[in-house]
């Protein structure tokens, strides 16, 4: 193992591990899938060489268990029942001479909605109880279905770990520590590694040759549907002119609006707390002023003074709500905004191209 003073700079995942994670997450989609990852730390690079899924304890609908999680799979990494299972799996891997160091866990996501309390609590449990140098791999099944693999590695920042351990998420504490929603996670670059034999085999694969048409097309319809479409680079392709908005982009916009509404609700709750606190402080100030006047009168009459700290028993200041939920929601809004920004470029160009047909008064009769 590398020295703890060497910071983690990257995550290297074996291709077989990536395939196992993709298969597990795709089979359980749209429900959450979680599992453990093992490997070793080499010079600040976390090499992940194997993985295995966590068993999920399904709670019957008619059960009356207290504190039963609403999503057992999401809470599986920190479940007590999985600790023995994970230790037994690592022991078996060690017996067959496989890297058996616990380096983190993985989870599935849908449309980038991985910024939640379950992920934070799981990663906090791993960095605090298991090993400080652990990561969480997040595989977005919906994003990967668009054609590009979405596999990201995250860790909780030391600043957020300290605040979460002390459960200090009040406005005063956040200002003192300068903790922002951008400081919740630290993302590490992910590299997918193949063995030399697999890399050599991939380079030896030959691309099948496309037969070249020998006869000219008799009509335009034959040109659009014949072999010229696949062989000619400049063949007409009208699919690029379609105005249908990507459903992934449309769903992201809906989720972004929902997160913004949640942020608005959290802001209203905090403003209500501030108004309630201001009212109580005014009442306390008025009571203290009245008590001082009474004590001044009693002092002139040489009577015993009344206690001036009695307001602590008579008045109760409202408790400030935790700002953790608001921070997580802000980080989720940022995640949705980044996804929309990455997908909006192609659609925006098409919308500007037909601007005259979309806006009234822009077309000429």
UniProtKB/Swiss-Prot annotation:
Major subcellular site: cytoplasm
Cellular compartments annotated: Cytoplasm
GO CC field: eukaryotic 43S preinitiation complex; eukaryotic 48S preinitiation complex; eukaryotic translation initiation factor 3 complex
Domain MPN: 11-160
A single BP term in Gene Ontology: formation of cytoplasmic translation initiation complex
Keywords, comma-separated and alphabetical: Cytoplasm, Initiation factor, Protein biosynthesis
Domain of life: Eukaryota
Listed GO MF terms: metallopeptidase activity; translation initiation factor activity
Pfam families named among the record's database cross-references: eIF3h_C (PF19445), JAB (PF01398)
Subunit structure: Component of the eukaryotic translation initiation factor 3 (eIF-3) complex.
Summary of the function given for this chain in its UniProt record: Component of the eukaryotic translation initiation factor 3 (eIF-3) complex, which is involved in protein synthesis of a specialized repertoire of mRNAs and, together with other initiation factors, stimulates binding of mRNA and methionyl-tRNAi to the 40S ribosome. The eIF-3 complex specifically targets and initiates translation of a subset of mRNAs involved in cell proliferation.
PANTHER family: EUKARYOTIC TRANSLATION INITIATION FACTOR 3 -RELATED
Family named by the database record: Belongs to the eIF-3 subunit H family.
Record-given protein name: Eukaryotic translation initiation factor 3 subunit H
Organism of origin: Aspergillus clavatus (strain ATCC 1007 / CBS 513.65 / DSM 816 / NCTC 3887 / NRRL 1 / QM 1276 / 107)
């Amino acid at each position: 193992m590398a020295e703890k003073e060497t910071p983690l700079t990257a995550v290297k995942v074996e291709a077989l591990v990536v395939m196992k994670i993709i298969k597990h997450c795709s089979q359980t989609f749209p429900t959450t899938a979680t599992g453990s990852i093992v490997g070793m730390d080499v010079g600040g690079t976390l090499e992940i060489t194997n993985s295995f899924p966590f068993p999920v304890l399904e709670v019957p609908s008619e059960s009356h268990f207290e504190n039963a999680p609403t999503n057992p799979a999401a809470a599986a990494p920190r479940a007590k029942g999985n600790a023995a299972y994970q230790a037994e799996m690592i022991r078996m891997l060690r017996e067959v001479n496989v890297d058996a160091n616990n380096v983190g866990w993985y989870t599935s996501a849908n449309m980038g909605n991985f910024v939640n309390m379950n992920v934070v609590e799981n990663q906090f449990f791993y960095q605090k109880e298991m090993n400080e140098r652990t990561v969480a791999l997040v595989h977005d099944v919906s994003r990967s279905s668009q054609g590009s693999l979405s596999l990201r590695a995250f860790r909780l920042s030391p600043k957020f770990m300290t605040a979460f351990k002390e459960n200090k998420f009040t406005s005063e504490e956040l200002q003192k520590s300068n903790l922002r929603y951008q400081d919740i996670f630290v993302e590490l670059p992910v590299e997918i590694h193949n063995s030399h034999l697999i890399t050599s085999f991939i380079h030896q694969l030959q691309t099948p040759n496309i037969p070249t048409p020998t006869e000219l097309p008799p009509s335009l319809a034959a040109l659009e549907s014949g072999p010229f479409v696949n062989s000619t680079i400049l063949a007409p392709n009208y699919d690029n002119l379609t105005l249908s908005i990507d459903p992934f982009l449309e769903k992201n916009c809906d989720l972004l609006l929902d997160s913004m509404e949640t942020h608005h609700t959290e802001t209203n709750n905090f403003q209500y707390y501030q108004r309630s606190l201001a009212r109580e402080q005014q009442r306390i100030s008025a009571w203290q002023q009245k008590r001082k006047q009474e004590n001044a009168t009693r002092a002139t009459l040489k009577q015993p003074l009344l206690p001036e700290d009695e307001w602590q028993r008579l008045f109760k200041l409202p408790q400030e709500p935790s700002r953790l939920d608001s921070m997580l929601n802000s980080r989720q809004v940022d995640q949705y905004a980044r996804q929309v920004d990455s997908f909006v470029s192609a659609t925006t160009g098409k919308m500007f191209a037909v601007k005259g047909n979309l806006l009234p008064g822009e077309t000429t009769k």
